[in-house]
């Protein structure tokens, strides 16, 4: 086990003492050592209400092989050895003596686990207080810090009773859980937008669900975590509308210019406002939906309000879904504008009674994963005031990069046949309310048909519809600080979405952080080896509470999880830069790779059907050395590595080839070859319900990325797809003369990948990708000019 920690601060001793006192501990350096030790260790069992109960708890802790903590304290000690203190500390952190560590040498385990410690014996009360302060900021076996663990057991439950008025509590630069999340005020309002997406002549009203600390009713104003979540009110069965992958790849006869595919913002319609008949300070509707994001729940107990809005076309709101269109961005912005006092909302949909977010400080962070993170990124590119930061996990920065690639229809990994129209149906939760649907069904079906037409599955080309959903075009407007989190094995929302957005905001005068993990499309806030919750606590305390805690400097610019060394996260200055830390090597496919042939015929669709494969089984088979698809691919290998190497950046392919057809699909996979137990792409549960989100409150599982039980022969590092008629970009078209050579350039997905010595790099070049592209039934023959083809590989040195 490794408990990496990036968010721990080390303030000077005076600050440490003041903070210890602030949380209710006896922390006077002039007190006698024995009395201070007794007071402090007793305080660490808040679940024990009496001295007798605390004595029993102390007796359960071993100081060394000869004494319990109760017996040691009874002797009124005047000092404590470093070893004895950390024997006690480890047990307080949830580790077991004799099982997890040796009482004669706790430091062996602490070093392996990356736990901090003082380097000397405790010979004064000041030493004891320093050790206790560090202990409170040390991570437990249950992922959270020790102070968090104490608070989860009731240590801070009476904090507000001792205050003249409700307030936030900061410790080590981070806000603490001194609010009872169980008592949160739950309410619903309807925010008036500027849009009419369902074409009924009225401004769409957007439902927003609010959970705010009860202390706001006593005058406390709080910042807001806002999650734009299209799934919040449920999803629909999309089996009937999911596309069957087409069997014919269309020959493109004409392309377009950049000007022709550039979307121009539409002028907002001059719509009448909803009438206003009064103002209220109390909502009329209870929030019946439960908060569904553990990250937000964690901060609710720390004095942040949490707001969810599903947006246009969802249950209890007006409008139609547009799958990432400007209307969905505007819907998210409308919520922020209400939270900052710049837009009206109503207590219900009919009476015209307005309500303000009087409890809000007007400082907002947007959070969430996938579609939720996408809308956070979209809102940030508007430059809306009040949005201080986004914490965007696996977000889409351009919808073309989600459903298309280089002129091809390319489904997100795991969702073959999905497209923008399918997702629109999936999230159109208005249809769950029959009384609502009967009035809009015909208009919705007409609207949906427009999406199906405009997404253009026939050519897969980039057009104005996709351009309107490319948020990177407006990245220069971003004013909010940005945290991006992405899985390096996320083939659903592929890594290019994060890295291209990261590059687009690189020169902006904002703070920005990037976290890359080895998972697929998953969260990392409950991954034990990373102190992600503390990192974001430090970040949000700075961003939303204005605390000068140095978060922008303390937190690394880039944190990357290693794919070989378990539970290892490394800090870097940037991704794929600076130049002094990176090198690119261009390798010729003929002289630097071994290949049995330079040609293949793509029979993948026939093989797929004959093998009764699925998308998942195909993805395994296509990168397996001995495979049913061996004759439908080109397999190139490099010699085994003599030393460890780390790929970091965007692999780039230059390929000269000829095909026997006027169009074709080319897929490329970069492979780690060699039998090994590699990390699973989904973190395994290590403690069911082990992460507590607040005192007597919700829990979630603690996870960890682990090597698989059985070795595998290969693993996908990166991949890419291209329509061979689109060698330059996704809108200009090249005519292909069958049998005549031509050249293409192809970027693969960004990666950070540790290749151990002895492994081999392999390059798989094939045609249709059964898991992601369409599935043509016509076979195509590919002839690769290996001598005039190369791959450029970026390395961190």
From Swiss-Prot:
Q: Name the Pfam families for this protein.
A: Peptidase_S15, PepX_C, PepX_N
Name of the protein this chain belongs to = Xaa-Pro dipeptidyl-peptidase
Instruction: Kindly list the biological process annotations in GO that this record carries.
Output: proteolysis
The record's note on quaternary structure and interaction partners says:
Homodimer.
- The species is Lacticaseibacillus casei (strain BL23)
Gene of origin? Answer: pepX
Keywords associated with the record:
Aminopeptidase, Cytoplasm, Hydrolase, Protease, Serine protease
Q: Does the keyword Repressor apply?
A: no
Single GO term (MF): aminopeptidase activity
HAMAP family with a match to the protein in the record: Aminopeptidase_S15
